């Protein structure tokens, strides 16, 4: 029994990760990570969540829900910034927890993140499909139900657009990081300009009476809390999924130029931009129309613009937002493929996944992520996916918060002293852990249940395969493909 516990508690030598990941090309700069982060965080959710949360939970105080969620996300981002600067390894939280707590806990954290990437890829692709179909429907272009809805939903068999957009994104990423980064930078600029356009035009249509009362009176319906601080809290748990994309930056830190400076600037900079955009959109949206009018509205931004007489602006914003969803797919598929590569690198999943092609890209891992993303995105409905995204990620965030205490003890020894340091240590990591736990507790019962099932599957997989095939403390020798 002692041997078993010693095995699962084995910690990876950071020097070995440095050697294994040294074959990945370091090409990404601060501007690339800013684009990657903003593009991933500011995805489908900025055009949908403000209206949904306002109508279902918080009313005009949806802006407070976004602000409180941003505070929690910001605290996690501070821990991520120091971790990524000290340990710029592929796989982010998985690799960090592996080094600091041991293999089993690293696997649990990584398995939690893998759920995020699988579901987020499918979620964004499903949202892309819904928005694109809504955009072209007024001009008479409409797919048959069998090809436009997930299996078993409204007569659907497969969401073909969701499948195609995932395949196209995978094709782009398979060609190299430089091409993907250039595309990401252009699309993010377009997306931010579209959001700014909505805010400017929306300001001209604000009715101040829509903000009163700013925090509606609390009431409990059959399924949700609405109004009061209870409604704001319920909104925080739902909104938090909007901010989790900054992990995609850390997952690619092994490909960063000068990660000591690049990683903190990319993580904190992209989250700061996203917070400003989210709160601005939320405030303008609930000011344009009474929050109750956004109930069951899948495209509140476009609807509000059309109803206020700005149909042309609505078409422009929606068209750019649809194109801009590629940015979130790029970010999530990059991060997910690097996490699968990390599992293969360490033997916890088949080592086939860690193979690098002649461009030093883990395209085999990308292929697996693509196949699973296509299956989930084209077969499961948008609403089902939305509730599952943040649960696993929150578990990984709790691990990272606690790992700060282990990291500080090893900085200057077998780990470098990073250029960026988390402020208010040792208080802030504990506060971060408690706040993330509160956000997790506010998730719905189904999300927690599915998360538990996912972890049970992960533990079974680790005990049956990963534990026996682990390459812990094995120095990797890289053999270029022939």
What are these regions (language model features)?
Residues 54, 64-65, 74-166, 171, ...:
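Hydrophobic transmembrane alpha-helices that form the core helical bundles
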Residues 129, 157-208, 267, 271, ...:
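Membrane-interface loop-to-helix entry segments
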Residues 154-157, 352-363, 397-448, 468-481:
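C-terminal membrane-solvent junction of multi-pass transporters and transport-like membrane proteins
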Residues 54-58, 62, 126-130, 145-154, ...:
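Transmembrane helix-loop boundary segments of multi-pass membrane transporters
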Residues 2, 130-138, 189-218, 283-289, ...:
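Hydrophobic alpha-helical segments and their helix-loop junctions in multi-pass secondary transporters
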């Amino acid at each position: 029994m002692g041997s078993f516990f010693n095995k699962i508690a084995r910690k990876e030598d950071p020097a070995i990760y440095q050697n294994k990941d040294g074959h990945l090309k370091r090409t990404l700069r601060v501007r690339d990570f800013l684009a990657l982060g903003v593009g991933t965080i500011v995805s489908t959710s900025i055009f949908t969540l403000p209206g949904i949360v306002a109508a279902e939970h918080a009313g005009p105080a949806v802006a407070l829900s976004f602000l409180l969620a941003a505070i929690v996300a910001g605290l996690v981002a501070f821990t991520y910034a120091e971790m990524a600067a000290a340990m710029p390894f592929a796989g982010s939280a998985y690799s960090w927890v592996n080094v600091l707590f041991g293999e089993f806990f690293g696997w649990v954290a990584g398995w939690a993140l893998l759920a995020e990437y699988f579901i987020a890829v499918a979620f964004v692709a499903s949202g892309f499909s819904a928005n694109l179909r809504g955009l072209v429907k007024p001009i008479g272009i409409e797919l048959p139900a069998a090809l436009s809805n997930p299996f078993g939903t409204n007569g659907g068999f497969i969401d073909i657009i969701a499948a195609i957009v995932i395949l196209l994104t995978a094709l782009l990423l398979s060609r190299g990081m430089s091409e993907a980064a250039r595309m990401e930078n252009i699309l993010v600029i377009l997306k931010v300009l579209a959001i700014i356009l909505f805010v400017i035009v929306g300001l001209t249509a604000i009715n101040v009476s829509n903000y009163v009362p700013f925090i509606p009176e609390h009431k409990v319906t059959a399924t949700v809390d609405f109004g009061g601080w209870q409604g704001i809290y319920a909104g925080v748990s739902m909104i938090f999924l909007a901010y989790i994309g900054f992990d995609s930056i850390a997952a690619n830190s092994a490909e960063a130029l000068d990660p000591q400076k690049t990683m903190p600037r990319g993580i904190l900079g992209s989250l700061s931009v996203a917070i400003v955009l989210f709160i601005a959109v939320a405030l303008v949206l609930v000011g344009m129309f009474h929050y109750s009018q956004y109930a069951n509205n899948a495209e509140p931004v476009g609807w509000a613009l059309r109803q206020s007489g700005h149909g042309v602006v609505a078409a422009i914003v929606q068209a750019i937002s649809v194109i801009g969803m590629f940015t979130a797919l790029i970010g999530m598929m990059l991060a997910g493929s690097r996490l699968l590569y990390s599992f293969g690198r360490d033997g916890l999943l088949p080592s086939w996944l860690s193979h690098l092609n002649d461009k030093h890209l883990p395209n085999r891992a990308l292929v697996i992520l693509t196949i699973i993303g296509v299956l989930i995105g084209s077969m499961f409905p948008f609403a089902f996916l939305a509730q599952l995204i943040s649960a696993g990620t929150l578990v990984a965030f709790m691990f990272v918060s606690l790992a700060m205490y282990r990291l500080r003890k090893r900085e200057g020894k077998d780990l470098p002293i990073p250029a960026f340091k988390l402020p208010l240590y040792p208080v802030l990591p504990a506060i971060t852990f408690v706040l993330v736990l509160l956000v997790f507790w506010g998730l719905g019962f189904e999300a927690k249940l599915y998360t538990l099932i996912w972890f049970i599957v992960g533990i079974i997989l680790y005990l049956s395969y990963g534990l026996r095939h682990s390459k812990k403390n094995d120095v990797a020798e890289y053999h270029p493909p022939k």
